[in-house]
Amino acid sequence: MTFLRIATKRAIYLHRPANPALPTSSILPVLHSTNVATRVPSPCAIRHSSHSPLGAAQANPRKKVTMQTLRNLYKKGEPITMLTAHDFPSAHVADAAGMDMILVGDSLAMVALGMQDTSEVTLDDMLVHCRSVARAAQSAFTVSDLPMGSYEVSPEQALQSAIRIVKEGRVQGVKLEGGEEMAPAIKRITTAGIPVVGHIGLTPQRQNALGGFRVQGKSTTDALKLLKDALAVQEAGAFMIVIEAVPPEIASIVTQKLSVPTIGIGAGNGCSGQVLVQIDMTGNFPPGRFLPKFVKQYANVWNEALQGIQQYREEVKSRAYPAEQHTYPIPKEELVEFQKAVDELPEEK
């Protein structure tokens, strides 16, 4: 019984309200949440770790976005919203903001892993990030890029990689770059029942062959090639196609010739929807970073975080933090008894 009294007493002190004016009754719910058998506070009742969870799913999440949901949006002419995410917090906020789709883009090579370009990221890298995103995305339809080197060798290689992305990464579909030449791979994947998003125009994984990050489809010949690629990708079974860095007029015409939605990135608002890299559009990067022309910066997350961290540093240096409200109280008699016990300890020689 002595142990039970001590454990219960400890729970009360750990959960004492920061405002001493609050009645003791405000503490009682904490005791009710303790384990009855031992009276030791349950994990749900105590969270004193410095590694705090980012929170549970929303209380009333949206209905899960499915391929049928996306088809209905397309038929109604309502633009489809897509945003990249590379980890739990970025997916959590994208989902909470109501994104229809979340893309685990291979752009995470640069924005999350500090790599030079997307060609460095591996399938195993993508799987780690996919799982992180999948844990947060309760409603949005999730898709992951197949990274360079994981699908170009053969349709069978593409299928094996796609299966791993869906099975191990826990996302709903895959995206791969390329036009007519990738049709066999797309067909093999979709035949196995895995949704595929195509990607034509500027394909960053092939930027070396394209002469860098250049606008595509600016000549009649190139525009016709773009349309041919789009039709081939659609015929192979892709349920959606990303069009990147293409003049808006060309992207609009291509969109009109297709029976599946297009998602533009640097391709104007004539597409069926839009996608941006979250880090770019939220301004979560240091000053001086190059931004493509098509990016609109909607926030300045870097600056907000910088100011907060600088203030934290200053308050730690000045001992303004932690203040009393950030600490756990101890009964005065316990403190006196502890100090007395310490004073009675023999001095070390």
UniProtKB/Swiss-Prot annotation:
Top-level taxon of origin: Eukaryota
Pathway: Cofactor biosynthesis; (R)-pantothenate biosynthesis; (R)-pantoate from 3-methyl-2-oxobutanoate: step 1/2
GO molecular function, one term: magnesium ion binding
Gene Ontology biological-process annotations: pantothenate biosynthetic process
Any one of the GO CC terms: mitochondrion
InterPro entries reported for this sequence: Pantoate_hydroxy_MeTrfase (IPR003700), Pyrv/PenolPyrv_kinase-like_dom (IPR015813), Pyrv_kinase-like_dom_sf (IPR040442)
Pfam families associated with the record: Pantoate_transf
EC number of the protein: 2.1.2.11
Reaction equation(s) it catalyzes: 3-methyl-2-oxobutanoate + (6R)-5,10-methylene-5,6,7,8-tetrahydrofolate + H2O = 2-dehydropantoate + (6S)-5,6,7,8-tetrahydrofolate
Annotated keywords: Pantothenate biosynthesis, Transferase
Similarity comment: Belongs to the PanB family.
Protein name: 3-methyl-2-oxobutanoate hydroxymethyltransferase
Organism: Emericella nidulans (strain FGSC A4 / ATCC 38163 / CBS 112.46 / NRRL 194 / M139) (Aspergillus nidulans)
